[in-house]
């Protein structure tokens, strides 16, 4: 057998959805009973989507064949009295299947753009379920919108900015690679889909795995030598964070083993090539006279390019959101630097020592997070309400159905880019200015 054939066999084994289902069963996740009748109903509901390239290769009723993202969802497990029950359990809420049965769990989040809801599942190991729910949230918007501001407002603005640069680069390349390779999510059945929020995206590579690899490695690279702490702490953090995020994606039924390995190795390659330029990029963003114009134009061009790679999916909006956030944070840091609101410590003060934890320090940190997040969320909601109707009006797109309107590039790109650009700008300029004004900077 040639090397190419062996590699093809290895790829096939690592991509096998049965391995994902086996891992789920090992962790106490099983599909509820009475799947066959409900599967036929789902196939009828999904028939109009047969033209989507993410749905090609599916044979209706074939339980083990290649199937697209989103198949076999909205299952109706049996009630204790034998009657069917609609899928009404969401966001990790649990109900009882019966007196002696394991509890059931629904999808973490409903996909607001596609209307998808994850199928219910029998979960017998709830500590693992909670752990992997936490792990998968380490790659979602809620985590990012808390994590990056916390670094910038409370810990180290320089590290926070450079983490964002790396995150934008890694996530952009990962999202574009997905739309070029176009591999579907693991087939369901046999896999149980516990999460469907990203189910309309392609699978290879896992951008959760990429983010879960890039962030902890970059944190250690950026902070070790700048801050005083034992290196062993960082060497413990990296595998714990990375493995938790990666395994959570298999547990949720969203990725094959191959997707995870590819995402991890792809991130290592990106960091090896681009990490030496992070310092140069950050300095350019802060100090160059025309940096804001170049930042906005470059990120917008990258967003337009990514929108041409494939038909509509939620990944296009996510890409625009990532690019908008990165552009806003970079532009905000430029303005903040030139106004002298936030100054990085001089090199002769390094390595920095952590300040003693006092009630005053802790109180200021909490106050900064509360005030800052309230302001950021207000900005996000206001920009949402402005940009979608405005884009619809400019491009003559009906906005009666917001979900359909957002599937047009002319609406989704400016909405996400402008909204999250303002969010990023608020994080690095408006909010620090408020802190300076009220005396908690």
Curated annotation (Swiss-Prot):
Site (Stabilizes the active site histidine for nucleophilic attack): 259
Pfam families: PAP2
GO MF annotations, alphabetized: dihydrosphingosine-1-phosphate phosphatase activity; sphingosine-1-phosphate phosphatase activity
Transmembrane residue ranges: 132-152, 163-183, 204-224, 227-247, 257-277, 290-310, 322-342, 359-379, 420-440
Catalysed reactions, as listed in the record: sphinganine 1-phosphate + H2O = sphinganine + phosphate; sphing-4-enine 1-phosphate + H2O = sphing-4-enine + phosphate
Tissue expression per record: Ubiquitous, with the strongest level in placenta and kidney.
Stretches the record annotates as Phosphatase sequence motif II: 205-208
Region described as Phosphatase sequence motif III: 248-259
Basic and acidic residues bias: start-end ranges: 32-46
Modification type Phosphothreonine: residues: 114
Location of Phosphoserine modifications: 101, 112
GO-annotated biological processes: ER to Golgi ceramide transport; extrinsic apoptotic signaling pathway; intrinsic apoptotic signaling pathway; phospholipid dephosphorylation; regulation of epidermis development; regulation of keratinocyte differentiation; sphinganine-1-phosphate metabolic process; sphingolipid catabolic process
Gene Ontology annotations for the cellular component aspect, listed alphabetically: endoplasmic reticulum membrane; plasma membrane
Matches recorded under InterPro entries: P_Acid_Pase_2/haloperoxi_sf, P_Acid_Pase_2/haloperoxidase
EC number annotated for this UniProt entry: 3.1.3.-
Region of interest (Phosphatase sequence motif I), ranges: 178-186
Keywords, sorted A to Z: Cell membrane, Endoplasmic reticulum, Hydrolase, Lipid metabolism, Membrane, Phosphoprotein, Transmembrane, Transmembrane helix
Family: Belongs to the type 2 lipid phosphate phosphatase family.
Functional note: Specifically dephosphorylates sphingosine 1-phosphate (S1P), dihydro-S1P, and phyto-S1P. Does not act on ceramide 1-phosphate, lysophosphatidic acid or phosphatidic acid. Sphingosine-1-phosphate phosphatase activity is needed for efficient recycling of sphingosine into the sphingolipid synthesis pathway. Regulates the intracellular levels of the bioactive sphingolipid metabolite S1P that regulates diverse biological processes acting both as an extracellular receptor ligand or as an intracellular second messenger. Involved in efficient ceramide synthesis from exogenous sphingoid bases.
Protein name, UniProt field: Sphingosine-1-phosphate phosphatase 1
Source species of the chain: Homo sapiens
Source species taxonomy: Eukaryota, Metazoa, Chordata, Craniata, Vertebrata
């Amino acid at each position: 057998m040639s090397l190419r054939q062996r590699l093809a066999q290895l790829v096939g084994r690592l991509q096998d959805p049965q391995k994902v289902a086996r891992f789920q069963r090992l962790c106490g996740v099983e599909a509820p009973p009475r799947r066959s009748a409900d599967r036929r109903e789902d196939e009828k509901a999904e028939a109009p989507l047969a033209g989507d390239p993410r749905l090609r290769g599916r044979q209706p009723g074939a339980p083990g064949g290649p199937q697209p993202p989103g198949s076999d969802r909205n299952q109706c497990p049996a009630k204790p009295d034998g009657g069917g029950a609609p899928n009404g359990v969401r966001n990790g809420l649990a109900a009882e299947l019966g007196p002696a049965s394991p509890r059931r769990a629904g999808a973490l989040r409903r996909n607001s753009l596609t209307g998808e809801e994850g199928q219910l599942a029998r979960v017998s190991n709830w500590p693992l379920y909670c752990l992997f729910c936490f792990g998968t949230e380490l790659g979602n918007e809620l985590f990012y919108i808390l994590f990056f501001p916390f670094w910038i407002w409370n810990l180290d603005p320089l590290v926070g900015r450079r983490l964002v640069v790396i995150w934008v680069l890694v996530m952009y390349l990962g999202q574009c690679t997905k739309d070029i390779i176009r591999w579907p999510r693991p087939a369901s059945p046999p896999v149980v889909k516990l999460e469907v929020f990203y189910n309309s995206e392609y699978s290879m590579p896992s951008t959760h795995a990429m983010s879960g690899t890039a962030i902890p490695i970059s944190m250690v690279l950026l902070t070790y030598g700048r801050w005083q702490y034992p290196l062993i702490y960082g060497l413990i953090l990296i595998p714990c964070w990375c493995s938790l995020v990666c395994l959570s994606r298999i547990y949720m039924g969203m990725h094959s083993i191959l997707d995870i390995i590819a995402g991890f190795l792809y991130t290592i390659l990106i960091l090896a090539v681009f990490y030496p330029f992070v310092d140069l990029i950050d300095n350019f963003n802060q100090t160059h006279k025309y940096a804001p114009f170049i930042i906005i134009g470059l990120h917008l061009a990258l967003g337009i390019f990514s929108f041409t790679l494939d038909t509509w999916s939620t990944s296009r909006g996510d890409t625009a959101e990532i690019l908008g956030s990165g552009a806003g944070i970079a532009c905000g840091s430029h303005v903040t630097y030139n106004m002298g609101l936030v100054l990085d410590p001089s090199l002769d003060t390094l390595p920095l020592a952590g300040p003693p934890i006092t009630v005053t320090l802790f109180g200021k940190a909490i106050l900064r997070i509360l005030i800052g997040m309230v302001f950021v969320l207000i900005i996000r909601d206001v920009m949402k309400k402005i940009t979608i109707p405005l884009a619809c009006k400019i491009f003559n797109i009906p906005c009666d159905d917001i979900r359909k309107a957002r599937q047009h590039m002319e609406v989704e790109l400016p909405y996400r880019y402008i909204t999250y650009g303002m969010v990023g700008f608020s994080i690095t300029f408006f909010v620090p200015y408020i802190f300076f004004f009220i005396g908690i900077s």
